[in-house]
């Protein structure tokens, strides 16, 4: 595996990426414009009595809502802020507390810079590839550089909120997904390689998968697979990519021999708490309206998270003699992950069972299975997110309630729904493995993925950033 000085690769990265996006995307948008859907952005007419604005319809091949709800829009703006908080500072602190003290700044920087990088890429091309009309596998170019998106533009996907709000809400999902991957390769990837990997992975993995599952054109959406808030699109996707990255990079120096305890569990607990609160925007916000379904998603999220934290705590207590704080917060995150695809489809009892299953299964995969196979999934991104997301997606097909989400699960006689969920999980897993591996090998051949042994021993805070938190 080639190792090169990471500092020499940042300038070419910036030149190539941003010149290509900001200069090259404009002609693409111009070429796509004749085929782009017509968009009207005329001024809204206020409806004072109902608090709703009447707006022109965006013609995207089928009728769109013609009214913007101020209440729904306010809820979606709030949810967007909550989900962004999940990454910065939530995930940054959660991961930052679990690494060794010589790598904490690099870990925090990963979440922070991924937020910045994905924001620009989502604006430039990612949103268009994920959520515009194209084919069953990928969207088109009609929203490159957000071309044609106006102040009052609405779409069939955005419902009764402006498309700009829907786009930004989806941006926060696109931000946290690659940020989650970093939990598997913490403490050993070059920062320059991280920038390249996150950029290519967003465009070639996340955007297509989001289109499959959440776009009205997507083949998994048309199949009838259920994923309310990202069990496969976000968590399975990120966790599988994390495992592939961990295997390609190899283990940390001294893994299995040297002690590598979390340097500050207080940061991790604070981060987990921020993730928990932000997850209400993640799940309940995915209803895209401030109504009964959002309320039920909030209830199921709270119940499943609490059940999973308790399940993890008790099984760890029985297995190891003491309940650890890290185990409690890991169980809570496992429950949040497991309920994500099901939160808008199941009732509280189904959520309780999904939470318990998520806590127990993720405890096993993050401890015994990882130790048995010997891979270095540093912060258990695979063990919690891939396993929890996949498990939750499958159990959605079991516990879905037609009166809540419009689709019955196996317990209501729709046994075939489990098959659709399995296809969803399998398709995302296979595509993710192949594409992630290819992206990593290309980057490794060009600039190298991993820091040198000396840099790893010194710590990534100093070797990659020239700074340190602790003297």
Give the location of each predicted region.
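Bacterial N-terminal signal peptides
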Residues: 14-26
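N-terminal signal peptide c-region/cleavage motif recognized by signal peptidases
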Residues: 25-27, 33-34
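N-terminal secretory signal peptides that target proteins for export/translocation
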Residues: 1-11
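Glycine- and aromatic-enriched membrane alpha-helices
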Residues: 33-471
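Intrinsically disordered, low-complexity regions
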Residues: 19, 28, 457-459
């Amino acid at each position: 595996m080639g190792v090169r000085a990471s500092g020499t690769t940042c300038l070419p990265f910036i030149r190539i990426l941003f010149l290509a996006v900001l200069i090259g995307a404009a002609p693409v948008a111009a070429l796509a414009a004749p085929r782009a859907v017509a968009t009207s952005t005329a001024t809204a007419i206020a409806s004072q009595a109902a608090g709703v604005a009447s707006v022109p319809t965006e013609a995207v091949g089928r009728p769109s809502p013609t009214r913007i709800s101020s209440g729904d829009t306010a809820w979606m703006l709030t949810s967007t802020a909550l989900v962004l908080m999940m990454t910065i500072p939530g995930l940054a602190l959660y991961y930052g507390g679990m690494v060794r003290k010589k790598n904490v700044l690099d870990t925090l920087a990963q979440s922070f810079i991924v937020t910045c990088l994905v924001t620009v890429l989502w604006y430039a091309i990612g949103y268009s590839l994920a959520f515009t009309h194209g084919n069953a596998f990928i969207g088109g170019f009609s929203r490159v550089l957000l071309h044609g998106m106006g102040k009052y533009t609405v779409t069939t996907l955005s419902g009764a909120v402006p498309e700009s709000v829907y786009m930004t809400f989806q941006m926060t999902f696109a931000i946290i997904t690659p940020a989650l991957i970093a939990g598997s390769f913490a403490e050993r990837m070059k920062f320059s390689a991280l920038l390249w990997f996150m950029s290519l992975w967003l465009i070639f993995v996340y955007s297509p998968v989001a289109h499959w599952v959440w776009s009205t054109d997507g083949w998994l959406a048309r199949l009838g697979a259920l994923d309310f808030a990202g069990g496969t699109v976000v968590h399975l996707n990120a966790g599988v990519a994390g495992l592939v990255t961990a295997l390609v990079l190899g283990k940390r120096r001294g893994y299995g021999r040297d002690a590598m305890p979390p340097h500050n569990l207080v940061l991790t607990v604070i981060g987990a708490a921020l993730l928990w609160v932000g997850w209400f925007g993640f799940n309940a916000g995915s209803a895209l309206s401030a109504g009964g379904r959002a309320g039920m998603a909030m209830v199921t999220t709270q119940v499943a998270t609490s059940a999973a934290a308790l399940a993890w705590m008790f099984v760890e207590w029985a297995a190891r003699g003491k309940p650890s704080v890290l185990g409690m917060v890991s169980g809570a995150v496992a429950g949040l992950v497991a309920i994500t695809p099901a939160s808008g489809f199941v009732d509280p009892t189904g959520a309780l069972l999904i939470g318990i299953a998520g806590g127990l299964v993720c405890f096993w995969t993050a401890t015994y299975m990882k130790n048995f196979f010997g891979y270095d999934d540093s912060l258990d991104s695979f063990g919690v997110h891939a396993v929890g997301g996949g498990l939750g997606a499958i159990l959605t097909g079991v516990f879905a309630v037609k009166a809540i989400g419009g689709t019955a699960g196996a317990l209501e006689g729709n046994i075939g729904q489990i098959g659709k969920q399995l296809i969803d999980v399998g398709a995302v897993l296979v595509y993710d493995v192949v594409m992630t591996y290819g992206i990593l090998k290309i980057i490794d051949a060009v600039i190298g993925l991993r820091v040198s042994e000396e840099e790893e021993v010194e710590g990534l805070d100093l070797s990659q950033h020239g700074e340190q938190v602790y003297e």
